[in-house]
Amino acid sequence: MKHKLMTSTIASLMFVAGAAVAADPTPVSVSGGTIHFEGKLVNAACAVSTKSADQTVTLGQYRTASFTAIGNTTAQVPFSIVLNDCDPKVAANAAVAFSGQADNTNPNLLAVSSADNSTTATGVGIEILDNTSSPLKPDGATFSAKQSLVEGTNTLRFTARYKATAAATTPGQANADATFIMKYE
């Protein structure tokens, strides 16, 4: 009899323990973070594609020995600015101007810098060229050649490259940031 009582007690305890495990857990809510939504409504002939509004152009890695004279350049690296929902009845042409920290030696180039306390390369700047291979001074006022707009999506093509500002360069990071403005006519 003692054995039956003990067996039934153990069975009851196992049932209660199983029921406790099987019960629905109490919901818990915790803060998960913040989501920032950004955008802009524009009264213009086109809207700049979100992919074009914030992009990175990778110029690559080059040996300092490649720069032996002022004006030496690297290969041109293409990039583009895509315009969406264009209405050529509002404006027939689009042009772009870039703005950024100009190089002290050659103000037609972007000055290079580094991030995270890395060493900055010297003796080079970054040159931006439009679709006619004309250099664009990063002053926010030198516009690219006008490009005719068609209805819908338009792609404005540019290139960038390193250009020597000295006969000798030193190694390091060679980064730059530029903003751009659109002009519709």
Curated annotation (Swiss-Prot):
InterPro entries: Adhesion_dom_fimbrial (IPR000259), Adhesion_dom_fimbrial_sf (IPR036937), Adhesion_dom_sf (IPR008966), Bact_Fimbrial_Adh_Pro (IPR050263). GO terms for cellular component: pilus. Disulfide bonds join 46-86. Keywords: Disulfide bond, Fimbrium, Signal. One of its GO terms (biological process) is cell adhesion involved in single-species biofilm formation. SUPFAM superfamilies: Bacterial adhesins. It is found in: Fimbrium. Belongs to the fimbrial protein family. Fimbriae (also called pili), polar filaments radiating from the surface of the bacterium to a length of 0.5-1.5 micrometers and numbering 100-300 per cell, enable bacteria to colonize the epithelium of specific host organs. This is Type-1 fimbrial protein, A chain. The lineage of its organism: Bacteria, Pseudomonadati, Pseudomonadota, Gammaproteobacteria, Enterobacterales. The gene is fimA.
